[in-house]
Amino acid sequence: MTLRRAVFLAENGIVVQGDAASAGDGRIPRLLPAAGPGLRLLRDAGFAFHVIGNRPCVARGECDEDELRTVARRFERLLEDEGVALTGCSFCPHDPHGVRRDYAVDCLCRLPRPGLLQRAAREHGLDLARSWLIGDSLDEIEAGVRAGCRTVLLDDGRESEWRLSELRLPHHVAEGLGEAALLILEDEHVLDWRRRAADSGRLGVGRG
């Protein structure tokens, strides 16, 4: 089987802040501006997509895994509306300090550990060495680096601690998902500077 390259999308980095915060409130999250066009550029370059995130609400007794499956379907529907298919969504339900004993464990899938990405790669035939992670926290960046991916940090103000180390240094920093897509395509030698200039204007990217 030929392994595919993918872009792992940290859930908080692709939707309007707060939209996907609750598993049980029934809201459909909204994509950030320029996310749809950026993802379509990556889709056209042959990338698969997989959403990841920590969901400790299960361990804390605030939701269950059925509700996480509902969240996953919301993300799938949201991206389908933009013409982008997901291989799936992977959420870590654990929290070492949770109240549900079966989920209050020190697991290998809670970001910044790489277990979510590694499991998705096994289940969906993804090549981690040729894949990228886009996230807006250094814990997400660290998970990508540990898994062997290249990474883009979205500088949207969510990261406040800035505890840097070799594992927490992104390959690129972008102002939004549209710019992140262009940076990835440049690194993959899919995009030259002429197309970058045209697509930057279409995606609302300030530089380029």
What are these regions, as identified by a protein language model?
Residues R202-G208:
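Short, basic, low-complexity termini and linkers enriched in Ser/Thr/Gly/Pro
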